[in-house]
From Swiss-Prot:
Pfam families: Pectinesterase. The keyword Membrane does not apply. This is Probable pectinesterase A. PROSITE patterns: PECTINESTERASE_2 (PS00503). One of its GO terms (biological process) is pectin catabolic process. Glycans are attached at residues 27, 191. It comes from the Eukaryota. The lineage of its organism: Eukaryota, Fungi, Dikarya, Ascomycota, Pezizomycotina.
Length: 324
């Protein structure tokens, strides 16, 4: 999503780094001022080592990761606001990202969904730019690429790849812009208030895109999928084999709006999971072969698109990078 420019400050590691603005550039081949560096020419050889170096500081900080594949499983629990940048030749999209973080383990093997995650975010105010995150386990079990379990999170030009339970938008307010999300079964799930703007969402097998877990009526959580492209893996016939979602918990709330829905979407649109569920499922102003709502089930009517204020609350432009 491209919004009017708003200058946001980003401090470096603290004692020696000066404040510098988030930069909108056609490429990012070197570290922004003040960032710790990871990679063959960086100070640290692993992302985990750079995270450890941040210690207990509460200052704003940033990490720049040079091109490469990093076989790591990382938890981000820094006490300050942290921004993580990946090297790329096109900052505006995930398509030319040169940094991949990958790990392979299923949830049963790890013990919990969170423990299976390649990247587990627990730090409020965290931002990630142009990084690919993969759980390589594949078909057969839940295996999470990203757990996003904090408030005011932003992911820009990132890629998240898995099969079942790829992206666990677990809790807090979250914003995904120009990202790629891949999976087959419940691959965007949880109970965050999450806005997905101008993302490519690709199913690689029959299944369900969302599995939202809103439980009680007083919870303000939503999944809003806005101006996104929903499609299937090239060469795989998924015609009418994918549902927009099913309710992991009884009051799931999801809207697809202003998006392109391909023929992979089943005419029924939505299906069931949680016993006794009365989900709030909406569609508004979508286009494409999968956008016909005449045979939809479990769907409620809505008179217009929902706003970012509705999903993320007032003041969202104080923590989202609106220059992106």
């Amino acid at each position: 999503m491209h919004l009017p420019s708003l200058v946001l400050g980003l401090l470096g590691l603290g004692l020696t780094a000066s404040a510098s603005p988030i930069e909108e550039r056609s490429n990012r081949s070197k570290a922004p001022d003040g960032c710790l560096t990871v990679g063959s020419s960086g100070k640290y050889s692993t992302i985990g080592a750079a995270l450890d170096a941040l210690g207990d500081s509460k200052s704003d900080a940033c990490i720049f990761i040079g091109a490469g594949t990093y076989k790591e499983q990382i938890t981000i629990d820094y006490k300050g606001k942290l921004t993580m940048y990946g090297e790329t030749t096109d900052t505006s999209s995930y398509k030319k990202n040169q940094v991949t973080i990958t790990h392979t383990i299923s949830s049963p093997q790890a013990g919990t969904l969170d423990k299976s995650a390649t990247v587990n975010v627990r730090s409020d105010g965290f931002k990630m730019y142009n990084i690919n995150v993969i759980n390589g386990y594949g078909k057969g079990s839940q295996a999470v690429a990203l757990v996003a379990n904090a408030d005011k999170l932003g992911f820009y030009g990132c890629s998240f790849v898995g099969y079942q339970d790829t992206l666990y938008a677990k809790a807090g307010r979250q914003y995904y812009s120009n990202c790629y999300i891949e999976g087959a079964t419940d691959y965007i799930f949880g109970n965050a208030s999450a806005w997905f703007g101008e993302c490519d969402i690709m199913s690689v097998g029959p299944g369900y895109i969302t599995a939202m877990s809103r439980t009680t009526a007083d919870q303000t959580t939503w999944y809003a999928i806005d101006n996104c492209n929903i499609y299937g893996k090239p060469g795989v016939d998924l015609t009418a084999k994918v549902y927009l979602g099913r309710p992991w918990r009884v009051l799931a709330r999801v809207i697809y709006q202003n998006s392109q829905l391909s023929n992979i979407i089943n005419p029924k649109g939505w299906t069931t999971m949680a016993e006794g569920a009365t989900p709030l499922y909406y569609e508004y102003n979508n286009k494409g072969a999968g956008a016909d709502t005449s045979k939809r089930e479990y769907e409620s009517s809505i008179s217009g698109a929902v706003s970012m204020n509705t999903v993320l609350g007032s003041g969202w432009n104080s923590w989202i990078d609106t220059t992106y």
